[in-house]
A protein has these predicted regions:
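A glycine/threonine-rich phosphate-anchoring loop and its flanking beta-alpha core
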Residues: 8, 105-202
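Short glycine/serine/threonine-rich phosphate/pyrophosphate-binding segments
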Residues: 17, 40-44, 70, 95-102, ...
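C-terminal charged capping/lid subdomain of soluble metabolic enzymes
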Residues: 3, 16-19, 299-372
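A short, small-residue-rich loop immediately preceding and capping a beta-strand
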Residues: 80-118
Length: 372
C-alpha cells in the first residue's frame, strides 16, 4: 500500500524571521497569525519588522481560544479572516500550535509554525493533542503532514520562562530511551528504522548543552547552547515522532506507535493525582519516568548517568520530588497498562514488573541523593 512521509524544514537563529518572505513566497501574499496571547505579543514586533517592505502582508492576529480542542478549531474555521488568508502562521506553545495544525489540516490551508517556547516538538510534528472542552485529554489527531516550515527564533526562546525550557529538556530526555526500547523486538521497516536511528541523537546534546542552556535562558541570552537544545527539543524529537508513529492507516496491521513508552506511561499514571499533575510539569514527570524505564530494562549504568544529569539541573530522581508516594504506584501502573504505549513494550509487560521498577527507582534515587 502506498503512503506519504512529509518531512519538516526549519530556520533557526535570533534573526531567522527575515527568511519568512523567501520561504513562504510560493504560497500567497497574505497570512493570518493564530496563537497564544503572550506568544503573539512577543513575536509580533519581530514578525512585522521581518515583513516590512516585502510582498507578504499579515492581515490579523487571532487568539487561538486557550486550548487545543475541536470547539476552538471550529470557531477559527468559521472566521472570514482565516478563510480569506492564503496561509496561516501558528505562534506559541504546543496547544496553540496543535490547534493551528489541526485547523489547517481540516481546511487544507498552508501553514507555518513559530514556536516561542522550546518545551516540546509540536511545531514540526504531524500529531496534535486534542482536549475536551473541560480541559481533559480527548485524543490524538493524526494529520496528513507537518508544517511546511518552522521558524525558531532563538532570541524569543531565550526570553521564554526558564521553567518551561527546563521541562522541555526533561521531556526530550525520554525520546532516545523510549524509541530504542519500543522498537527492540519489532520488524523494523524503512520509516520507523530511520526514526530509531535518529532517536539515538537526542540524549547527548541535552547532557552536553543542557545546563549551560538553562543558565543562558535564565539570563535571556541567545547562544549556541540555546540553539542546540532548541534544535534537539523541537526538530530532532519532532522528526523522530513523525517517523515512529503511523496510526492513520485504514489497515490496522500497518499501524505502529514507537514514539514513546514507559517514561510517558509514568506520566499518564501520575496525571491521576492532582497533587502531582497541578504542581509539576509534563517534562519534569517524564524525566523521572526515564529513570523508571532504565530500571525496568536493567540499564543500571545508564540510569546512574541520568541520575547525575537530573540532579545537575534539578530534575527529579525520586517519587517524592513529584509529590507521589509508594502507595500511588499501583494506580500509576494500572493506568499505564491501558495506554497505547503499553502495547508496544518489548516482551510481555506486567503491572507487577512496572510497579517494582518504579519502586526500585525511587529507592535508588533516595540512595543516590543521600550520597550526593
Amino acid at each position: 500500500m502506498s503512503y506519504n512521509e512529509f518531512l519538516p524544514s526549519y530556520s533557526i537563529g535570533h534573526d531567522c524571521y527575515k527568511e519568512i518572505p523567501y520561504v513562504t513566497r510560493r504560497y500567497g501574499k497574505t497570512a493570518v497569525v493564530i496563537g497564544g496571547k503572550t506568544a503573539m505579543e512577543k513575536a509580533k514586533p519581530e514578525l512585522l519588522a521581518a515583513l516590512k517592505g516585502s510582498d507578504l502582508e499579515i492581515t490579523d492576529f487571532i487568539w487561538y481560544g486557550g486550548d487545543s480542542n475541536y470547539e476552538n478549531i471550529e470557531m477559527l474555521k468559521a472566521m472570514p479572516e482565516v478563510q480569506n488568508a492564503d496561509m496561516v502562521f501558528g505562534v506559541g506553545g504546543g496547544r496553540a500550535v496543535d490547534t493551528v495544525k489541526t485547523l489547517c489540516d481540516r481546511i487544507d490551508k498552508p501553514f507555518f509554525t513559530f514556536p516561542t517556547l522550546a518545551s516540546n516538538c509540536a511545531s514540526c510534528t504531524a500529531i496534535s493533542v486534542i482536549y475536551n472542552a473541560d480541559g481533559t485529554f480527548k485524543e490524538y489527531a493524526y494529520l496528513k503532514a507537518p508544517a511546511l516550515h518552522t521558524f525558531i527564533n532563538t532570541k524569543i526562546i531565550a526570553e521564554s520562562p526558564e521553567k518551561l525550557f527546563w521541562a522541555g529538556i526533561g521531556d526530550a530526555l525520554s525520546k532516545e530511551y523510549e524509541v530504542v526500547f519500543a522498537c527492540r523486538d519489532k520488524d523494523m521497516t524503512h520509516t520507523p528504522l530511520l526514526g530509531r536511528v535518529l532517536a539515538e541523537a537526542c540524549t547527548e546534546p541535552l547532557v552536553s548543552y543542557g545546563k549551560k542552556a538553562l543558565e543562558d535562558c535564565r539570563n535571556n541570552v541567545s547562544s549556541k547552547n540555546i540553539e542546540q537544545i532548541a534544535l534537539d527539543i523541537i526538530i530532532t524529537t519532532g522528526l523522530v515522532s513523525n517517523f515512529t508513529v503511523h496510526q492513520n492507516n485504514p489497515d490496522p496491521k500497518d499501524d505502529y506507535y514507537y514514539n514513546s513508552s514507559l517514561a510517558h506511561c509514568v506520566y499518564y499514571g501520575a496525571s491521576l493525582f492532582p497533587k502531582c499533575e497541578h504542581d509539576h510539569l509534563h517534562g519534569e514527570i517524564v524525566s523521572f519516568g526515564v529513570l523508571c524505564l532504565l530500571t525496568y530494562d536493567e540499564q543500571f549504568e545508564e540510569r546512574q548517568r541520568i541520575f547525575e544529569f537530573n540532579r545537575s539541573i534539578g530534575l527529579p530522581c525520586t517519587l517524592g520530588e513529584i509529590a507521589l508516594t509508594e502507595e500511588d504506584v499501583p494506580a500509576i501502573a494500572h493506568k499505564a497498562a491501558s495506554v497505547v504505549e503499553w502495547t508496544y513494550v518489548p516482551g510481555e509487560p506486567t503491572e507487577e514488573k512496572f510497579i517494582k521498577a518504579i519502586l526500585d527507582t525511587d529507592k535508588a534515587g533516595k540512595e543516590f541523593l543521600a550520597k550526593a
